[in-house]
Amino acid sequence: VTKAVENINAIIAPALKGMDPVKQAEIDQKMKDLDGTDNKGKLGANAILAVSMAVCKAGAAEKGVPLYKHIADLAGNSKLILPVPSFNIINGGSHAGNALAMQEFMILPVGASSFSEAMRMGCEVYHALKGLIKAKYGQDACNVGDEGGFAPNIGSNDEGLNLVNEAIEKAGYTGKVKIGMDVASSEFYTEDGMYDLDFKNQPNDGSQKKTKEQMLELYNEFCKKYPVISIEDPFEQDDWEPCAKLTTENICQVVGDDILVTNPVRVKKAIDAKAVNALLLKVNQIGTITESIEAVRMAKEAGWGVMTSHRSGETEDSFIADLAVGLASGQIKTGAPCRSERNAKYNQLLRIEEELGENAVYAGESWRHIGW
């Protein structure tokens, strides 16, 4: 952090002094030129991004418009859309101490008529889940993880999906609330090209190892058995062939995070290879607002979905809420409706919806296909 602050004060600030904050692309390009590396390795993506976001906020203030409106203008987007929240309500993978291999089990209230109704649905399912977990696994299992989700001692992915489905039914939202998953499969990809669903238990007998073909079958089963509509990082980040196969089958949205890292170069490659059909947008992976807009533009032109995302380690900053509305991403992933740094984003989205009044449009059933 001190190095990033030092780079901002000593190198970036003097170079940008006097530039117009409304001219986001010019300023972002200036910082990229100052850095001079492909991966922003000299000044650091976190230093460059902090300035890029601050400039974006200053540009909105100079124009006297809300941040989301300024972002929409920068992107040349005329549609302000409230996104479908993808609440991470059960944690597994490397984020949790249970036996669950897959990292996130999420709910998406696509059947809501407004963002505020989607929030209510999400909260009700979340609390129904808490009741089920308490009854089945005990009070201890109700502790929450980094992103506000529960991490009960679930033994299998099927058990996790079943629990989420049960909570949706208990809350009375069958058909209106769907399920999403972040498999984060690179975490349990083995040297012999297999996927070890028992990777947390080492050493193990290898009975839970699966081939890419078996993983493909497993995802098909999940989508048939449960209302799963979105799967993120289903295969290892460089294992593009089975990922493309799953995308072609068109049984759900296939989201690229590790495979794309919000990099326009990798996005272009994935579009050509038809490897996935949705972009996970993490601004700190690419490092500037301009490049983030470019990645979203490419994704939308390819007919992809876009999910704006937080990070596991978050702050109270709500910038990504405005970003999701301004870029009409249609989806946002920023944790469970729990923990203040997660709710900060949801509260900002509620404020934006209120501010837009009768002009507020919720993505709802169109969550995957919103053009500019």
From Swiss-Prot:
It catalyses: (2R)-2-phosphoglycerate = phosphoenolpyruvate + H2O. Pfam families: Enolase_C, Enolase_N. Coiled coil: none annotated. Its cofactor is Mg(2+). GO terms for biological process: glycolytic process. The active site is at 147 (proton donor), 282 (proton acceptor). Its main location: cytoplasm. Its EC number is 4.2.1.11. It comes from the Eukaryota. Homodimer. PANTHER family: CYTOSOLIC ENOLASE 3, ENOLASE. Belongs to the enolase family. This is Enolase. It comes from Chlamydomonas reinhardtii (Chlamydomonas smithii).
